[in-house]
Every structure is written in C-alpha cells, then in structure tokens.
Amino acid sequence: MAATELQADPWLSEKLGKPAFNLRKGFTEFSLSLLPSSPAFVSAKVATTEHEACLHLQRQGFRVIDVGLQYRGKPNQFEISKIGQSFRTARNEDEPAVCQIAAEEFLLNRFHEDPEIPLIISSQIKRDWVANFFLGKRGDVLLVATVQDEVCGFLLLIHQGNQFVIDLIAVKSRFQQQGIAKNLICFAWKHHRQSAQEILVGTQISNSASISLYSHLGLELK
C-alpha cells in the first residue's frame, strides 16, 4: 500500500483562511490524525474505479463535490466562424475585465459546488487564479475575445510538453451561445499551439455546455 502523501497548498490556504492540502496518494491509509492542524481543507482526486478509496475517504469525512472529466485531441475546426468577434493576446489593461469574468462566470467547479466554501470566496479564488497571469505566476498565454472592443471572454493556456492545456476558459453570460468559446480554442490552436500535438482540458460532469463544446470540437474523453 502506498504511504499517504499530503501536499500543502499555501496559495489556497491563504484564500480559504485555513491550512489546505492535496491528498496525492495513499487514500486508504488516510486518517484525520495525519493533519498537522484542524480545521483544515483537504482535497483528493480519486478515480471512479477506486471504490475502496472512495468509501474510506467518505468515512473520514470527505464528500464527493464533483466528478471531473478530461478531454484531449486535436480540434476538428480551425477557422473563426463568427463575424464581429475578434481575438488577441491579453494586454495589461484587460486585467479588470478578465478578472471580473472569472469572478462571475465560473459556477460549475469544485469551489463553487462545495457548500462549505462561501460564494464570495469561491469567486475570489477564480478571480485571483487568472490575475496570477498578469503577475507572471500562472499560465503561458492569455487570449481574450472582444465584441465591439468589449472583452467578453478569455482563455488561459499552459504549454506542457507536446500538449497545450486549457487552464481556464470563460465567456460573459450575455455573450454565451454565440460560438465564442469554440472560436477562442480554434484561434489558440491556430496561432499559439507552438509544438503542441494535442489539447488537454478538464471539466465537470455537471457542465453539459463544456462537454458539448469539447465533443463538438472532436476532442475525446480521456
């Protein structure tokens, strides 16, 4: 059996106001006595096939918050298909608009779906997450979508070997259902793929819009 591995998350600890850890392995060996302090926040990503681990963690007080999905592959579309939409790399002056979108539009994720985390904190986590790009602490490329010079969406990319990872993607509510997210991904693949051979992106099983988008682009469930 693998020994329990708890990895401290200083950034998330600051946001939550309590020690935060990621449980990396040794799920069936975990017990609350291993925590250096309490109360604390501990998250774990467990494969749905690891039934014993899931049951053990729930007995230790864990709750299932979401079920994550990963998609990968090459998009089957490359052209921007909507007139009136423009796409470019982000500028420093885009930070307020991008951060506002991040704070308001991410509702289906492990922070917002956790009833123990207040909405104001969940929103601040997403705001600060993308703000770290402007501080040079997160991501390699940030792209924005504009309509009539208004920033209406963004995509944060991380280059990881032969993949480019979609770290965050969001579109303002009143601009949704207009193909902006799809076009952002196509623009990124066409102009910022570098040596990447495929896209890797995660979402939640509750996010039907994202599942439809990635499937429509020809990405496959990992």
Where are these regions (language model features)?
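A short, internal acetyl-CoA/4′-phosphopantetheine-binding micro-motif in the GNAT/acyltransferase core
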Residues: K18-T28, A47-T48, I169-Q177, T203-Q204
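Acyl-donor-binding surface of acyltransferase catalytic domains
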Residues: R24-E93
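Conserved acetyl-CoA-binding loop-helix of GNAT-fold acetyltransferases
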Residues: T28-P36, L168-V171, Q177-K190, S212-H216
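Conserved GNAT acetyl-CoA-binding A-motif
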Residues: S37-T48, Q163, H192-T203
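Conserved beta-hairpin
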Residues: V46, R138-H159, K172
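Conserved active-site alpha-helix within GNAT-family acetyltransferase domains
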Residues: T49-V64, Q178, K182, I205-K222
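Active-site rim helix/loop that mediates acceptor-substrate recognition in acyltransferases
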Residues: H51-H56, P118-L143
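A short beta-loop-alpha structural element at the N-terminal edge
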Residues: S86-A102, F106-N109
